[in-house]
Amino acid sequence: MPNSSSNVIDGRAIANQIHSETAKRVEYLKSKGVIPGLVFIRVGEDPASVVYVGMKEKMSAQLGISSKTFVLPEKTPQSELLELINRLNNDPSVHGILVQAPLPDHISQEVVYSSVSPRKDVDGFHPLNVGKLLLGDKSGFKPCTPAGIQELLIRSGVNTEGADVVILGRGEIVGKPMAAILCQKAKGANSTVTICHSRTRNIEDHCRRADILIAAMGVPKFVKAHMVKPGAVVVDVGVNRVPDPTAKSGSRIVGDVDFENVQPIAGKITPNPGGVGPMTIAMLMQNTVRAAELATGIAL
């Protein structure tokens, strides 16, 4: 049984490795007169979105990526947002466009994601990039969180080949693309994948046979110790705000995994925060630099 924090995967440390690699690519592009450009679009003042965009802006600056944020009022018409995206699609100084979710109810997320040029879709949500992912076509952009989880597993020495992977959650951002990535005939994949969701029967039984358990349901501390096979790798993707009278804000963020009780049983486990989150940003930066390389034909 693991003790202390010896089995905890340090997502921040691995993300920093990737940032170092990305920074070298940025330096090379700049030496050739190309500055990678990333634009964030935020509609409304969702508190979490403000924080997330701020973190991405900060990392862009640290890596030498030029970033700009457009903040639109909550009641902005969809047509106005699409006009902005079209302008950015045609701006050669912009290599990546990220529309921060969630969007207001009157704006169709599907329409917005489809309007971003696939060549600038650094989030990996355009239908063309989703299709490429399913086909195993590596020319597209992978969604940042699933791609970050795969990289986390690879760099942590987790063998995914032939592994029974259980993914909790069937969402478009994590669950479905994660399954597609791990099914590929590729490094860090070749897994046998099961997706569980709210209608899954005997979900605990599925969890208990997982060699790798990826929790992305959005249910606080859903994964309990009795649901985890001893020695399994547990990845916690959940971001859930729960009341906490002891916190200044009156709430705190917890994951989908009961970390304190699962950690002693797991072979490896990601903390939350400090696990998947930093990897998501690392992959966004990597996608942006790759978009700049593809747009200019310049690469290290």
Regions found by a protein language model. Give the residues of each.
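Rossmann-fold NAD(P)-binding glycine/threonine-rich loop
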Residues: 109-131, 237-299
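Positively charged, low-complexity intrinsically disordered leader regions
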Residues: 2-34
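Anion-binding alpha/beta catalytic cores of soluble intermediary-metabolism enzymes, centered on
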Residues: 96-165, 206
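N-terminal glycine-rich anion-binding loops that anchor highly charged ligand groups
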Residues: 28-38, 45-62
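Active-site cofactor/substrate anionic-group-binding motifs, chiefly glycine-
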Residues: 49-93
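Glycine-rich phosphate/diphosphate-binding loop of Rossmann-like nucleotide-binding domains
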Residues: 43-57, 137-233, 237, 242, ...
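Glycine-rich phosphate/diphosphate-binding loops that line cofactor/substrate pockets in enzymes
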Residues: 27-35, 87-92, 157-160
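N-terminal small/polar loop signature for handling phosphorylated ligands or for N-terminal nucleophile
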Residues: 74-96, 106, 196-222
